[in-house]
Amino acid sequence: MAKAEKGVSAKKIAQERVDILFERAKEARDEPELSARYVSLAREMAMKQRVRLAHYHRRSFCPSCHAYFIPGTNLRVRIQHGKIIYTCGICGAVTRIPLNKKTESR
């Protein structure tokens, strides 16, 4: 077996970089291609290092085209039948999130 590395773990570094990339995507709202690229890089890094994305990161981009959501610009939000419905304005993908006491407390 390989020895564990001393110092900061690779997963912790990856999580910090994912957070930074999502911050950059938020700052680059005016440039949709750049913000989508930041989101794609963050997802790739998280998948490669097997780091889970936080729920607020998972819901901040389109799962289909990886566009960073900006409500009113490229995102339509509706509440119907006990679900929050996100509709991407770029690709038209629909994401349904159950609305229950668990999600309200987050």
From Swiss-Prot:
InterPro entries (alphabetical): RNP4, Rpr2/Snm1/Rpp21, Znf_Sec23_Sec24_sf
Coiled coil (residue ranges): none
Localization of this protein: Cytoplasm
Class of the enzyme per the UniProt entry, highest EC level: hydrolase
Enzyme Commission number, as recorded: 3.1.26.5
Cofactor: Zn(2+)
Any one Gene Ontology cellular component term annotated for this protein: ribonuclease P complex
GO MF assignments: ribonuclease P activity; zinc ion binding
Cofactor info, note text: Binds 1 zinc ion per subunit.
Main location: cytoplasm
Signal peptide: none
Reactions catalysed, as given in the entry: Endonucleolytic cleavage of RNA, removing 5'-extranucleotides from tRNA precursor
Residues at which Zn(2+) binds: C62, C65, C88, C91
GO biological process: endoplasmic reticulum to Golgi vesicle-mediated transport; intracellular protein transport; tRNA 5'-leader removal
Keywords assigned: Cytoplasm, Endonuclease, Hydrolase, Metal-binding, Nuclease, tRNA processing, Zinc
Job of this protein: Part of ribonuclease P, a protein complex that generates mature tRNA molecules by cleaving their 5'-ends.
Family statement: Belongs to the eukaryotic/archaeal RNase P protein component 4 family.
PANTHER family given in the database record: RIBONUCLEASE P PROTEIN SUBUNIT P21, RIBONUCLEASE P SUBUNIT P21
Subunit annotation: Consists of a catalytic RNA component and at least 4-5 protein subunits.
Protein name per the record: Ribonuclease P protein component 4
Source organism: Methanocorpusculum labreanum (strain ATCC 43576 / DSM 4855 / Z)
Gene: rnp4
